Amino acid sequence: MKNFTCIPGLIFILVTVSFFDMNLNAQENKITDARGKMKPWKEGAWIRGKYRNIFLEAGYKQADIDAKLAKAYSDVFEGPGKVYFEVGDSMAYVSDVKNHDARTEGLSYGMMIAVQLNKKDVFDRLWRWSKTYLQHQSGPREGYFAWSINPQTLKHNSEGSASDGELYFITDLLFASNRWGNNTGINYYAEARRIIDAMWVKDGSNGITNIFNKEHKQITFTPDTFGYNWTDPSYHLPAFFELWAEYAKDGREQFYRDCADTARMFLHRACHPVTGLNSDYTEFSGAPKSTPWMPAAFRYDSWRVPMNIAMDYSWFAKDKAWQQDYARHLQDFLSGKGINTFEDQYNLDGSLPDYILQAGGYKKLRHSIGLVATAASASIMGTQEKSWRFVDALWNAKLEPYSDGYFDPYYDGLLYLFSIMHLSGNYQIIKPITSN
């Protein structure tokens, strides 16, 4: 019994320390703001026809908001740290410069930014390059895209696809069709349908599958036998699936609406009920999935989830109660870590992971602008006073090298630009032009 004589005292100390820590966290989360509690809209833009300008609501001047968006675009597409590179008279690509490749992720993000900001030449250049150098024109993968390429040698780093690339390309092209029509040099709708139609004839033959797992009505990690039976939560964009039901016009409207509903319910399961965090990869049940290259945790892919949920709220607001609750949990957790100091990788319970996923040759935790940005976008669903502080944090953030020299104008930069678009009301559903 001698070894246990100190246990009561130890318990007292642990309880006292735990209570002290909880009290500190509670104090950290009691953030007040003169602007009061945020009040999210009750209807999405699909019905309301309008988009919130959160920056304006936060007290920033419209001229400054316009300048902020213009500078963010310039930094990512035109400045000395740009990731957009023109090739000849009619093509361009977006490069993950820190990893020396071009990806369907970045190319399709660039196209989305271009169609949102009405930059047709940029959109067309990116599409031509993607179609020429990444899209498979024949064989089992016909219509799909190689997800990574060396832009200097034009050699594919992989022939396989990442399902989010096709997801964005299709949505980009449908939006372009709605905005610019199909008679200005590129038949955007036909290009979107080519990908969609190619997707639906892939039945697993030669190992190539649909982008969707048809049984689960969920997007796959990769449309092949390797990734067909699991997923990436950041690929679950119910807002996009809703729009496919409206604009793809391929007779599968109900399937896409079912996928949107399923994606929302999937996110309920994938996101931790206290921290709001999700794993980069999961089973279709939402259970975290480890892979041979890394254990399950909230890492870089997961940064996109708050922004995706905010988009769904802004556009459709079909899952308001849960999405507001999600924003509260996530922002409570991050503010508890310090709005200006929270790290960029976590275990789902909020503890720091033992394994740190490196980026661009750097293997360390940092306060990354990409997560600062997407955490701020969650304020679209915010109901607390502290949600304003996340908006302010994004407003004050700078897309520039960190003190150790690390700089990511690609992933950090694109998420930064996307989030500024969301919070300024410039990331919108593009409906077809109607003639009077």
Please provide the spans of the model-predicted regions.
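Aromatic-rich carbohydrate-recognition surfaces in CAZymes
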Residues: 100-110, 156-180
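Short glycine/serine- and small hydrophobic-enriched flexible loop segments
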Residues: 111-118, 168-179, 239-246, 307-314, ...
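Internal amphipathic alpha-helical repeat/solenoid segments
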Residues: 54, 58-106, 114-136, 140-158
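C-terminal functional modules
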Residues: 352-436
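Solenoid-repeat scaffolds in large eukaryotic assemblies
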Residues: 110, 122-123, 185, 192, ...
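Bacterial Sec-dependent N-terminal signal peptides
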Residues: 1-27
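Extended ligand-binding clefts on enzyme/binding-domain cores
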Residues: 30-71, 100-104, 139-144, 158-164, ...
